[in-house]
């Protein structure tokens, strides 16, 4: 509402630009290993990620979860804030008119408690981030254990406006898995 809404939109735009800058910069590293070997550690996208957005800051929370996940190459299925789901559908219209390929961002609205369980149990979802109360995060971890889904939970209130807490390399790292390639060299 009013100034708060304007600040949230400004912060969301800033966050989108931040992660757009990372799209071609999140690279792997190489390590020298004993015995004439080199190891390449390459981050790869998790695949299909489920994102359960926070109830507070519906736009900024959505952008804070979606942007890092797609910046490193994932496809996302998003459960937006149940309090303001139209913010997510409006954001989707922005993505639809951009260069974003169809199907990269998928938004499902409805009863949060039912959708969370189904998303956590779904075998085609490879990773799941949950921004909700402690009980919901615990439930997501429990339902995701059936197919060893990678999970990351944010329980309790988080200041989504603070870039030190809600953006950065930790989000990019959690959206990838590292593949190590061992290469022998020398004589």
Show the residue positions of the predicted features.
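Short acidic capping loops at alpha-helix termini that bridge into adjacent secondary structure
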Residues: 47-48, 102-105
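C-terminal segments
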Residues: 14-25, 29, 129-187
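Short helix-initiation/N-cap motifs at beta->coil->alpha
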Residues: 111-115
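Short acidic amphipathic segments
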Residues: 125-126
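Residue-level signal for inorganic ion chemistry
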Residues: 73, 105, 119
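Substrate-binding/gating loop at the entrance of the active-site cleft, primarily
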Residues: 31-89
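N-terminal Rossmann-like NAD(P)+-binding subdomain of aldehyde/semialdehyde dehydrogenases
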Residues: 1-37
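Hydrophobic/aromatic ligand-binding patch that stacks against planar heteroaromatic rings
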Residues: 67-70, 118, 143
């Amino acid at each position: 509402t009013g100034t708060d809404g304007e600040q949230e939109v400004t912060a969301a735009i800033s966050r989108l630009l931040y992660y757009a800058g990372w799209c071609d910069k999140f690279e792997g590293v190489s390590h020298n290993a004993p015995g004439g070997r080199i190891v390449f550690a390459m981050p790869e996208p998790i695949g299909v990620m489920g994102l359960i957005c926070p109830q507070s800051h519906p736009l900024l929370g959505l952008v804070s979860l979606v942007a890092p996940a797609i910046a490193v190459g994932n496809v996302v299925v998003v459960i937006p804030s149940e309090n303001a789901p139209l913010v997510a559908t409006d954001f989707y219209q922005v993505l639809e008119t951009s260069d974003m390929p169809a199907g990269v961002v998928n938004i499902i609205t409805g009863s949060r408690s039912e959708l969370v369980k189904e998303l956590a149990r779904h075998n085609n979802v490879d990773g799941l981030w949950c921004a909700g109360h402690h009980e919901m995060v615990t439930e997501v971890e429990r339902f995701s254990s059936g197919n060893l889904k990678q999970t990351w939970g944010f329980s309790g209130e988080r200041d989504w406006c603070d870039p030190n807490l809600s953006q950065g390399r930790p989000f990019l790292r959690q959206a990838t898995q590292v593949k190590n390639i061992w290469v022998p060299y020398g004589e």
